[in-house]
Amino acid sequence: MTRQYSLDLLEKIQEKQETINVQGAEVLVKNIPDCDEKGAMDPRLYKDMKVQMNIMRFMPKNMMKMDASEKSVKNMRKQFNGIKSVPIVTKDINITNETVKTEDGYDIPIRIYNSISKRENAPILYFIHGGGFMAGSPDVVEELVKLIVEKTDILAVSVDYRLAPEHPYPIGHTDCYTTLKWIYENAEAFGGDKNNIFVAGDSAGGNLTQYCTTRDMEDGRNLVKGQLLLYPTINMCDYEDEFYSWSIDKYEIAPKYKKGLEKLLNVMHSMAGGMAEILGTQDIHSKYLSPYVDVNPDYPCTFITVGEHDFLMIECLAYAAKLTKKGVDTETVLYRGLGHAYGDNVGVYPQSEDLAIEMGNFILKHSRK
């Protein structure tokens, strides 16, 4: 299938990018390729979101909540499990299915992605999907993973960890960490470099990624060469400090989109409060669920990306600033005009392909160090 945009737009994104400073952190800003209006939504995203935003303007608050009820989980899974990307990868990518045995005897399904032109002793991207800890699957992010593999000739592994609320915290988290250890132990068998493992995840997967890195450091294994956090959930307890406090006034929104976007952002921010119930724990202040609270200066190199109109934008940029202040080698990319989960739109939004390029460049650059 062909891209739903011209490659000229991809080039425009790179031509129009600029660097700004946000609370001491250097941020690479990717402007909308075909719109210069400040605070505008990307026209492709607006086309997809217009009806939803209009509906939300008149929807009562009691209909906009996220909890562990069967109805809520079913609705969230229906929303998060849809595949929005279209295939644009032309290189043959071999996909191998394996399982990883947990301490309680469960077999975690994983997928290994291997291009026909794979590098010898290739760096490994270990990707953990998002979905609010209770939805999503490797299918949703598969085109992003395959695109990175195509552009870099590295190896990739994705994991289908157990989901809440059926499997409460920390089961999903430990599944992901168990898989990380398996990748290290078996890397050479599938042609990967165990000393160049990069863990990545989107949204809730970003939280799971940071968990893997933190546990890896605590256990003294040092398996993680770098981490890539795509619009991650890293401040579940909404902890405020010199870098972070959430306010709708911190969003730049053009008048045309203001009512709809402000309602959407406020709702999404308030819905995040239901995470404790979904995960089956009240321990959301811990460094594992809210890593923003306790930043370790010894974290490996970190890549962060977030959209200008993402409800997590404020905490993601605050996290980048906090990591930078602690001395962590941090690269941050902000996409103007986008919201949440644009990694799920490969072949549809040019920014999704640009993200794959940025992630690949980060991995290749740091794997040489």
Segment roles from a protein language model:
Residues 1-87:
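N-terminal targeting or regulatory segments adjacent to alpha/beta-hydrolase or S9 domains
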Residues 2-41, 94-369:
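Alpha/beta-hydrolase superfamily serine-hydrolase fold, recognizing
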Residues 83-98:
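A domain-start/cap signature at the N-terminus of enzymes
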